[in-house]
Regions:
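Short, contiguous alpha-helical
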Residues: 2-5, 9-11, 19-38, 42-94, ...
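Acidic/histidine-rich alpha-helical segments that form the ligand environment
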Residues: 92-134, 149-155
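Charge-dense, low-complexity intrinsically disordered segments
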Residues: 9-16, 20-23, 99-106, 110
Length: 182
């Protein structure tokens, strides 16, 4: 994310239908992440704030993992994509956070962008195969199966939580603040 064009913040439609509003809200959160993690070197992506070990690089890698887990594995029942397909999360449940320090900014950004691109295609596939009511390919421990609608809400929540973290970390790196790159 070397340019502001990577971090275009798209507003959801002010009076859109449910699908356009959900997808718009998710894309807006992705845009915030792109902006807050953009144009940083390795030191910026490895910076921490206070006692936390969270970094913007770890955040990018984590969100790439979540994109893959939610839309490839849970929604469609497909195998994990690399690098997640060879990770022993039982040995290190936070592997993506810990291993991000070994990756270059370009690797982290590419990993996240590729995961987002795959997710967009997988969501479009699910929309064509049942819309927001399409059920996921997995069930919760209590036997219920979430719909695409629920998975989109969960992803919006995941991103919104981490955008708050990204705001604080990025401000500590170089003073960048705000909600809009304009």
């Amino acid at each position: 994310m070397d340019s502001d064009s990577d971090a275009i913040l798209r507003e959801p439609p002010p009076a859109g239908n449910e699908l356009d509003t959900l997808l718009g809200a998710l894309e807006r959160q992705r845009g915030y992440v792109a902006w807050k993690c953009g144009n940083l070197d390795s030191a910026g992506l490895r910076a921490t704030l206070g006692p936390s070990t969270m970094t913007l690089g770890g955040l990018l890698k984590h969100l790439a993992a979540v994109e893959d887990d939610v839309f490839s594995v849970k929604l469609h029942g497909r195998d994990r994509h690399p690098p997640w397909d060879t990770v022993d999360f039982g040995a290190d449940p936070d592997w993506e956070w810990h291993s991000a320090a070994e990756d270059s900014p370009g690797q982290l950004v590419s990993l996240w962008q590729e995961a987002v691109s795959r997710s967009r295609a997988l969501v479009a596939e699910a929309i064509a195969d049942g819309g927001l009511d399409r059920l996921a390919s997995y069930t919760w421990p209590d036997g219920r199966t979430p719909s695409l609608r629920r998975l989109l809400i969960d992803m919006i929540e995941e991103y919104a939580r981490h955008v708050g973290h990204a705001d604080l970390i990025r401000e500590s790196v170089d003073g960048l603040v705000g909600e809009d790159p304009e």
